[in-house]
Swiss-Prot record:
The lineage of its organism: Bacteria, Bacillati, Bacillota, Bacilli, Lactobacillales. PANTHER family: NICOTINAMIDE-NUCLEOTIDE AMIDOHYDROLASE PNCC, NMN AMIDOHYDROLASE-LIKE PROTEIN YFAY. Belongs to the CinA family. This is Putative competence-damage inducible protein. The gene is cinA.
Length: 414
């Protein structure tokens, strides 16, 4: 089963938008046992798209097109595919109802060109859009099938997961399937992680082990090809156990959509605990990161951004003498910030971030960061870290390290 992905959009060719859809679709199709042999990007040009379709149908059983389903004249994917297949475009009634409902609720006039979004290819199956207005299409002509999806990832991904995947499973049943498990690691670089599990990688067959470096973390994707899903999961578990026996100290969670922040928030939710923070160099980034996670309001009452020495004294009540003696970038300051914040917010935990993201300060080089951790009924501690690269990387690295310190403190109590 050979598939091809065609991304439509001049903005992709100009580099104005990164084609993340191809990555998502390739992984999803592979999981269904469908091999992707070609990926192509074409601009909003009907002639070039027509030429590409003619080439693609000579070499692929499934052609997946993403983008060009919107309301404007340059959104021409459906029109070109329909013309190529000598088929008409018809209005989808369900999509039309949702379109009218959207504009009625938003109290905006609906222009005529919006009707283009609810056109589907005659004789095909319509894919409803749970997060947008443009419907998709799935149509088979001869030995070639065409799947049309919207371009925005926040529309393409739900449409694929909810509508396209079941259609593809029915249309292209496979004897074997690929199932994957993603392991996430923090505090170890890709090169070190690969070195630690080199013997496993060198002898991998089924499952396979694929490392991926991400900002401030590393993931491993374990993938098995199997006819039996239960047996496949058992193989993944056996491989996971071998991996974690070597690098388990750095493991924090599973899944593509997971994060260190989400895992930490979930732990606090499970324990019914709260956290606050006093931030200097991170300027609220830690608190903002918590706020991105669902359920954060239950574990985070509020916090403090104390960038200057004056605000550390006035907002947190840290003594002028302590700051003059030890400096703001110090263990003593970090401890006081964490404990004062915890007391003021009446939280179970208090974190603090103080350091140097810009030019050297108080004799401390750029990248020096002290992170304090206060816990009700426990001695307050602070650790010093040294991060490289630019200002934002230093700040983001500090937040990640703070999350990991808190996560480890919580799980070590279990």
């Amino acid at each position: 089963m050979k598939a091809e992905i065609i991304a439509v959009g001049t903005e992709l060719l100009l580099g104005q938008v990164v084609n993340t859809n191809a990555t998502f679709l390739s992984e999803e199709l592979a999981a269904l046992g469908i091999d992707v042999y070609y990926q192509t990007v074409v601009g909003d040009n009907g002639g070039r798209l027509e030429t590409l379709l003619t080439e693609a149908e000579q070499r692929s059983d499934l052609i997946v097109l993403c983008g060009g389903l919107g309301p404007t004249e340059d959104d021409l994917t459906k029109q070109v595919v329909a013309q190529h297949l000598h088929k008409s475009l018809v209005e989808d009634q369900e999509g039309l109802n949702r379109l009218h409902q959207f504009f009625q609720q938003s109290k905006r006039p609906m222009t005529e060109n919006n009707l283009r979004q609810v056109l589907a290819i005659e004789g095909g199956q319509v894919l409803q859009n749970p997060t947008g207005l443009a419907v998709g299409s799935f149509v088979t002509e001869g030995t070639t099938s065409y799947l049309l999806l919207p371009g925005p990832p926040n529309e393409l991904i739900p449409m694929f997961q909810q509508a396209a995947r079941p259609l593809l499973i029915d249309a292209f049943p496979q004897e074997e399937q690929l199932i994957s498990r993603v392991l996430r690691f923090y505090g170890i670089g890709e090169s070190q992680l690969v070195t630690e599990i080199q013997s496993l990688i060198a002898h991998q067959t089924n499952p396979t082990i694929a490392p991926y470096a991400k900002p401030n973390e590393v993931t491993l994707r374990l993938t098995v090809k199997t006819k039996d899903l239960v047996a496949g999961e058992e193989l993944l578990t056996a491989t996971e156990e071998k991996v974690l026996a070597k690098v388990g100290d750095y493991f924090y969670g599973y899944g593509d959509d997971n994060s260190l922040a989400k895992v930490t928030v979930d732990l606090l939710l499970q324990n019914g605990q709260t956290v606050t923070a006093a931030e200097s160099l991170t300027a609220g980034l830690f608190q903002s990161t918590l706020g991105e996670i669902a359920g954060a309001s239950k574990i985070f009452k509020g916090g403090f951004v104390t960038y200057s020495q004056e605000t550390k004294e006035n907002f947190l009540g840290i003594s002028h003498e302590l700051l003059e003696e030890h400096g703001t970038v110090s263990e003593a300051c970090a401890k006081e910030m964490a404990e004062k914040a915890r007391q003021l917010a009446k939280s179970n935990y208090g974190l603090s971030f103080t350091g140097v993201a810009g030019d050297p300060l108080e004799g401390q080089p750029t990248g020096t960061v002290w992170i304090g951790l206060a816990e009700e009924g426990q001695p307050t501690v602070a650790e010093c870290f040294h991060f490289n690269r630019d200002r934002n990387y230093i700040r983001q690295s500090a937040v990640m390290r703070g999350l990991d310190l808190l996560r480890r403190r919580i799980i070590n109590k279990k």
